């Protein structure tokens, strides 16, 4: 939000308000949208207590609110990963709301849209699906806690940006690379001879999920121990 005069954020999937309570600290204008009246009442009570009393609470459907929204600097969605029977879902199209049907409206009504998706999702396929018919995926963030991948975040925008960036976070450790170098090709990072006494490096969960092994090898000056190995 650096350089923006009056940035705003809209959380279309408010829930318990945890996400918006953190993001609202960075902006003067924030809106929380949630269908369940009970959760809205909880949000109205909690927001002033945690120093984000400026957050506007809207009790209603997030998708319907998007349709009548003018513009917001930033839109956030954490689509529900449950089907009508309560079963867990992973695919974007199976989550509610379905971002694939809203992506063009989201990017036309915001400078940036952040979508939180299942860490089980194939991010390569997600990029293909989200970019189908348009070019909107700008960043991918893979977030791990204690070496367990917890969140997969996609930054969408109609604002042109090359190349696509991937950010891998594990606790206090962070690594970034461009999509063009996020390949699992091992041809030029294989080390045929392993010297006794050298360190053995195993990438963390976010890096393994990203598959940016070539850029990792270049950045750390290491070689894979075998052609199809992810140990360095």
PLM regions with names:
Residues 1-4:
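Glycine/alanine-rich phosphate-binding loops at beta-alpha junctions
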Residues 12-13, 33, 60, 77, ...:
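Short His-Asn-centered micro-motif
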Residues 16-28:
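Conserved SAM-binding loop of SAM-dependent methyltransferases across substrates and taxa
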Residues 8, 28-29, 54, 112:
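Residues at the starts of beta-strands that form the adenosine-phosphate
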Residues 33-74:
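S-adenosyl-L-methionine
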Residues 6, 71-72, 110:
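Local beta-strand N-terminus motif with an aromatic residue
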């Amino acid at each position: 939000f650096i350089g923006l005069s009056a940035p705003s954020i809209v959380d279309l999937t408010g829930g318990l308000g945890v996400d918006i309570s953190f993001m609202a600290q960075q902006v003067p204008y924030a809106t929380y949208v949630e269908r369940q009246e009970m959760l809205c009442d909880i949000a109205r009570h909690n927001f002033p207590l945690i120093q984000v009393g400026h957050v506007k609470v809207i009790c209603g459907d997030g998708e319907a609110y998007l349709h009548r929204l003018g513009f917001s600097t930033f839109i956030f969605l954490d689509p529900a990963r449950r089907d009508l029977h309560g079963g867990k879902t992973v695919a974007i199209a199976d989550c509610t709301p379905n971002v694939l049907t809203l992506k063009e409206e989201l990017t036309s009504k915001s400078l940036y849209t952040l979508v939180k998706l299942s860490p089980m999702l194939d991010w390569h396929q997600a990029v293909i699906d989200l970019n189908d018919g348009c070019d909107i995926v700008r960043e991918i963030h893979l977030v791990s806690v204690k070496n367990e991948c917890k969140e997969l975040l996609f930054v969408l925008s109609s604002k042109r940006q090359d190349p696509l960036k991937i950010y891998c976070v594990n606790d206090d450790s962070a690594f970034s690379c461009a999509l063009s170098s996020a390949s699992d090709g091992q041809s030029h990072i294989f080390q045929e001879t392993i010297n006794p006494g050298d360190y053995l490096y195993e990438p963390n969960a976010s890096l393994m999920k990203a598959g940016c092994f070539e850029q990792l090898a270049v950045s750390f000056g290491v070689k894979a121990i075998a052609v199809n190995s992810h140990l360095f």
